[in-house]
Each structure stands twice: as structure tokens, then as C-alpha cells.
UniProtKB/Swiss-Prot annotation:
Species in which this protein is naturally found: Bordetella petrii (strain ATCC BAA-461 / DSM 12804 / CCUG 43448)
Cellular component aspect of the GO annotation: cytoplasm
Record's subcellular location: Cytoplasm
InterPro entries in the record: PRA-CH (IPR026660), PRib_AMP_CycHydrolase_dom (IPR002496), PRib_AMP_CycHydrolase_sf (IPR038019)
Family membership noted in the UniProt record: Belongs to the PRA-CH family.
Biological or metabolic pathway of the protein: Amino-acid biosynthesis; L-histidine biosynthesis; L-histidine from 5-phospho-alpha-D-ribose 1-diphosphate: step 3/9
Cofactor details (free text): Binds 1 Mg(2+) ion per subunit. Binds 1 zinc ion per subunit.
Binding site for Zn(2+): C81, C98, C105
Name of the protein this chain belongs to: Phosphoribosyl-AMP cyclohydrolase
Catalytic activity entry: 1-(5-phospho-beta-D-ribosyl)-5'-AMP + H2O = 1-(5-phospho-beta-D-ribosyl)-5-[(5-phospho-beta-D-ribosylamino)methylideneamino]imidazole-4-carboxamide
Encoding gene, per UniProt annotation: hisI
PANTHER family tied to this protein: HISTIDINE BIOSYNTHESIS BIFUNCTIONAL PROTEIN, HISTIDINE BIOSYNTHESIS BIFUNCTIONAL PROTEIN HIS7
Keywords for the protein's UniProt record, in alphabetical order: Amino-acid biosynthesis, Cytoplasm, Histidine biosynthesis, Hydrolase, Magnesium, Metal-binding, Zinc
Cofactor list: Mg(2+); Zn(2+)
Length: 134
């Protein structure tokens, strides 16, 4: 018996039962991170207002901030036009979304002419990860 909420029928999970989830700062629009959700993670996120993802490496639910304290409170949950990507507009507790101690996981920018371009780190570490994860 399917116990999914009715709205879940509009969500197009991939063959692995996952959907990409973009976390965006609700105040300034900065993209913080991209993760994955399965049905359980999406349902729990919608029910609790706290971001829950699916960790592909650990093969379990990942309640954002469970180890670091850097939780994400969801202010708005959206589904894209094809139903295959979700957008979470969040308040990022502590201002750090990335496991590297930065505000965003998108801290490297491609710089230089096309033939010799390289990735350059452009955003600072706000807190040493050694002091975040114990």
C-alpha cells in the first residue's frame, strides 16, 4: 500500500528513487549546495520544515546539521517545471552549508582564457572543518 502524500505523485524521481535538491539562501538567493532526496527525505522535509537529504555515500538519510549543527530551516519548497528537481529556500544556521567550512559549496570559479583556464578558490573558509566535525 502506497502511503505517500498525494502531492508526491508530481515528483519525478530517477531510476534510483532520487531527485536532485538545490538549497538556496532564502534571504539573498545564494545557491548553497546541491544534494539528493528520496521519497522519505522529501516527505520528512515537508513535514518538519528541516532539510533532510539522502546520502548516497552513506546510504542513509542525512538530516542536514546533525553532526555540524548547521541545520537548514526550509521556508519554501518548490518543484521545477519537469518535476525532476526540487528547490529548497532555506535559512542556513551558522551561515555554513559546505563541509569545507564555507557558506556555499560553490566556492571555486573558472578564471582565465579558455585554453588555460583553471578553478580558483574565491570564497573564504568561515570555520575550520576540524572544529565543526568532532
Amino acid at each position: 500500500m502506497n502511503t505517500d502524500p498525494a502531492w508526491m505523485a508530481d515528483v519525478a524521481f530517477d531510476d534510483n528513487g532520487l531527485i536532485p535538491a538545490i538549497a538556496q539562501d532564502a534571504e539573498n538567493g545564494q545557491i548553497l549546495m546541491v544534494a539528493w532526496m528520496n521519497r522519505e527525505a522529501l516527505a520528512e522535509t515537508a513535514a518538519t520544515g528541516r532539510a533532510v537529504y539522502w546520502s548516497r555515500s552513506r546510504q542513509r538519510l542525512w538530516r542536514k546539521g546533525e553532526e555540524s549543527g548547521h541545520t537548514q530551516t526550509v521556508h519554501d519548497l518548490r518543484l521545477d517545471c519537469d518535476g525532476d528537481v526540487v528547490l529548497l529556500k532555506v535559512h542556513q544556521e551558522g551561515g555554513i552549508a559546505c563541509h569545507t567550512g564555507r557558506a556555499s559549496c560553490f566556492f571555486r570559479r573558472l578564471e582565465g582564457p579558455a585554453g588555460s583556464a583553471s578553478w580558483v578558490t574565491v570564497d573564504p573558509v568561515l570555520k575550520d572543518p576540524e572544529h565543526i566535525y568532532k
